[in-house]
């Protein structure tokens, strides 16, 4: 039996690690969830994701409610108060329970002397909630995005930035990819129906299913047997443009965690696939995905800027480059991105993408296809990146995705309920 732990203090410490230390929630949360009971796992996730999604609002409120910010060793208390405010604002937890558990969290973080302060701040919010929220809703903080990102979105999308921000602040739907080597989408939807769950097919992507209500993977028919994979619809769109064929040599570059590697093999089971990623730790996820789906690929650790180190002079029929990016298209799914990224990261990422594109292009066969994809919505990483590549690469030709002046296809967050994603299909003359 798991030891009873204070979830509010655990959530506060996790959020502090993201915001103050730049750690990714996807690395922090799973080990924490192993320490709590199954029924508490979902609440811990909700508190962490929710606080990060609404961080700027909670920060704004604390600055209004407290004369001085909590600093130094007491900084965790700042995040504990955030967790308390989030519960009062956004959950159905009874206020008395939310307050009691949050105040008790001070003991868990070894700050019992501050229980009275935490209780006082949260009760003050309850008394002043109406006027505080009215003031907040008239401020720029209401967009729940850092100012640097808001400015970039406003510049790139003068007509659409508000809908992008709104989509980023929503909870994401759960999308699945049906493994066509086991089931047609319709036959798997029938199995889902028999299991008492409802799903909806995507209009454009033939393997994509959206669940009416998110569910744990072990409840999905055939998940352990590889019948279905969790993957956003927009990520599945890569296969529309890559169009892999049996017998081809295909490179999946920046492949971890392996969702697109396995999708290639579902579409073209007899393709020879090489999956490469720079992060050796994340490559373990590629192996796990291949094993669950019963598939084989050549998996290598390597830097996309130096392909000769891991593939010699080998050339490929098709290359999928899911480039390292700001991930600004998947904020609704990973709200910590808003607080992990910095404005200075964007030109650095654009430079890295440019170097990888230039390095991998010679490894594409004449007549071959390269699909450049990102989960970003920023032009510097997307259309401007491809436009510059086309201008300096004489044997590269844009195919089916946009125009040379405005290359690529940009999906915005929430469009057809998918994530923000960019694709450009390039052919080697």
Curated annotation (Swiss-Prot):
<keyword id="KW-0698">rRNA processing</keyword>
<dbReference type="InterPro" id="IPR018314">
    <property type="entry name" value="RsmB/NOL1/NOP2-like_CS"/>
</dbReference>
<dbReference type="InterPro" id="IPR001678">
    <property type="entry name" value="MeTrfase_RsmB-F_NOP2_dom"/>
</dbReference>
<dbReference type="Pfam" id="PF01029">
    <property type="entry name" value="NusB"/>
</dbReference>
<dbReference type="GO" id="GO:0070475">
    <property type="term" value="P:rRNA base methylation"/>
</dbReference>
<dbReference type="InterPro" id="IPR006027">
    <property type="entry name" value="NusB_RsmB_TIM44"/>
</dbReference>
<feature type="binding site">
    <location>
        <begin position="254"/>
        <end position="260"/>
    </location>
    <ligand>
        <name>S-adenosyl-L-methionine</name>
    </ligand>
</feature>
<dbReference type="InterPro" id="IPR004573">
    <property type="entry name" value="rRNA_ssu_MeTfrase_B"/>
</dbReference>
<keyword id="KW-0949">S-adenosyl-L-methionine</keyword>
<keyword id="KW-0489">Methyltransferase</keyword>
<dbReference type="InterPro" id="IPR049560">
    <property type="entry name" value="MeTrfase_RsmB-F_NOP2_cat"/>
</dbReference>
<keyword id="KW-0694">RNA-binding</keyword>
<dbReference type="InterPro" id="IPR023267">
    <property type="entry name" value="RCMT"/>
</dbReference>
<feature type="binding site">
    <location>
        <position position="277"/>
    </location>
    <ligand>
        <name>S-adenosyl-L-methionine</name>
    </ligand>
</feature>
<dbReference type="InterPro" id="IPR029063">
    <property type="entry name" value="SAM-dependent_MTases_sf"/>
</dbReference>
<keyword id="KW-0808">Transferase</keyword>
<protein>
    <recommendedName>
        <fullName>Ribosomal RNA small subunit methyltransferase B</fullName>
        <ecNumber>2.1.1.176</ecNumber>
    </recommendedName>
</protein>
<dbReference type="InterPro" id="IPR048019">
    <property type="entry name" value="RsmB-like_N"/>
</dbReference>
<feature type="active site" description="Nucleophile">
    <location>
        <position position="375"/>
    </location>
</feature>
<dbReference type="GO" id="GO:0006355">
    <property type="term" value="P:regulation of DNA-templated transcription"/>
</dbReference>
<dbReference type="Pfam" id="PF01189">
    <property type="entry name" value="Methyltr_RsmB-F"/>
</dbReference>
<feature type="binding site">
    <location>
        <position position="303"/>
    </location>
    <ligand>
        <name>S-adenosyl-L-methionine</name>
    </ligand>
</feature>
<dbReference type="InterPro" id="IPR035926">
    <property type="entry name" value="NusB-like_sf"/>
</dbReference>
<dbReference type="InterPro" id="IPR054728">
    <property type="entry name" value="RsmB-like_ferredoxin"/>
</dbReference>
<keyword id="KW-0963">Cytoplasm</keyword>
<feature type="binding site">
    <location>
        <position position="322"/>
    </location>
    <ligand>
        <name>S-adenosyl-L-methionine</name>
    </ligand>
</feature>
<comment type="function">
    <text>Specifically methylates the cytosine at position 967 (m5C967) of 16S rRNA.</text>
</comment>
<dbReference type="Pfam" id="PF22458">
    <property type="entry name" value="RsmF-B_ferredox"/>
</dbReference>
<dbReference type="InterPro" id="IPR023541">
    <property type="entry name" value="rRNA_ssu_MeTfrase_B_ent"/>
</dbReference>
<comment type="similarity">
    <text>Belongs to the class I-like SAM-binding methyltransferase superfamily. RsmB/NOP family.</text>
</comment>
<dbReference type="GO" id="GO:0005829">
    <property type="term" value="C:cytosol"/>
</dbReference>
<dbReference type="GO" id="GO:0003723">
    <property type="term" value="F:RNA binding"/>
</dbReference>
<dbReference type="GO" id="GO:0009383">
    <property type="term" value="F:rRNA (cytosine-C5-)-methyltransferase activity"/>
</dbReference>
């Amino acid at each position: 039996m798991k030891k009873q732990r204070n979830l509010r203090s655990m959530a506060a410490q996790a959020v502090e690690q993201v915001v103050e230390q730049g750690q990714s929630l996807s690395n922090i949360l799973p080990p924490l969830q192993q320490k709590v009971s199954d029924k508490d796992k979902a609440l811990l996730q909700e508190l962490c994701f929710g606080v990060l999604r609404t961080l700027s609002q909670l920060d704004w409120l604390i600055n209004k409610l407290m004369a001085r910010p909590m600093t130094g060793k007491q900084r965790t208390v700042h995040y504990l108060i955030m967790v308390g405010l989030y519960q009062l604002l956004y959950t159905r937890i009874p206020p008395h329970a939310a307050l009691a558990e949050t105040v008790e969290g001070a003991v868990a973080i070894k700050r019992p002397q501050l229980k009275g302060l935490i209780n006082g701040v949260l009760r003050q919010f309850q008394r002043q909630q109406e006027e505080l929220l009215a003031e907040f809703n008239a401020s720029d903080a209401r967009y729940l995005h850092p100012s640097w990102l808001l400015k970039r979105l406003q510049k790139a999308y003068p007509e659409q930035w508000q809908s992008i921000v709104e989509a980023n602040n929503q909870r994401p739907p759960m999308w699945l990819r049906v493994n066509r080597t086991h089931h047609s989408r319709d036959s798997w939807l029938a199995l889902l129906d028999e299991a008492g769950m409802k799903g909806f097919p995507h209009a454009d992507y033939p393997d994509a299913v959206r669940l009416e209500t998110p569910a744990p993977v072990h409840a999905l028919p055939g998940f352990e047997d590889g019948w279905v994979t969790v993957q956003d619809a927009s990520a599945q769109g890569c296969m529309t443009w890559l169009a892999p064929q049996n017998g081809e040599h295909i490179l999946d570059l920046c492949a971890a965690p392996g969702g697109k590697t396995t999708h290639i093999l579902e579409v073209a089971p007899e393709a020879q696939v090489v999956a490469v990623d720079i992060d050796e730790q994340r490559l373990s996820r590629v192996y796990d995905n291949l094993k669950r789906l019963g598939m084989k690929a050549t998996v290598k650790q390597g830097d996309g800027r130096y392909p000769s180190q891991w593939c010699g002079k080998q050339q490929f029929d098709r290359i999928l480059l899911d480039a390292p990016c700001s991930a600004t298209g998947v904020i609704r799914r990973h709200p910590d991105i808003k607080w992990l990224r910095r404005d200075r990261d964007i030109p650095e990422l654009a430079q890295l993408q440019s170097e990888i594109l230039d390095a991998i292009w010679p490894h594409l066969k004449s007549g071959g296809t390269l699909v450049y994809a990102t989960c970003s919505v920023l032009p510097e990483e997307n259309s401007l990146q491809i436009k510059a590549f086309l201008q300096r690469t004489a044997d590269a030709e844009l195919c089916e995705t946009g125009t040379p002046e405005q290359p690529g296809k940009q999906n915005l967050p929430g469009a057809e309920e998918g994530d923000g994603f960019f694709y450009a299909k390039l052919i080697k003359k």
